[in-house]
């Protein structure tokens, strides 16, 4: 994910699930988002899920085995994709929800059988999807 071969091009679909937050830094994750679009044919679609800091202390977790992206980070990445590759990206849905599953935050050692939100250090995290398509060829 840090060194995508340049000959991997022309694909209709690129997908990752909870992966690019493990590249070691916010910057590395955002670079992956930009680089992965080169793999797509014009009109190809990408879907990536990642960790999203949805609460807790100010700031975020960066330069670690898992990083937590903020809304500002995700919007920056989306802006670069739109500008560089004319990507059409679905709007982010960052609604927290009000149901019991939405409001429950699991804490280490994560005993709950299922959860939507985790306490990671000083922050609350959940998963968010980035969905888009590549525009013109570059």
Language-model features: locations:
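Short conserved loop adjoining the S-adenosyl-L-methionine
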Residues: 2-8
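Local beta-strand N-terminus motif with an aromatic residue
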Residues: 10-12
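A short, conserved alpha-helix within the catalytic core of class I
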Residues: 23-36
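A C-terminal cap/extension of S-adenosyl-L-methionine-dependent methyltransferases
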Residues: 92-138
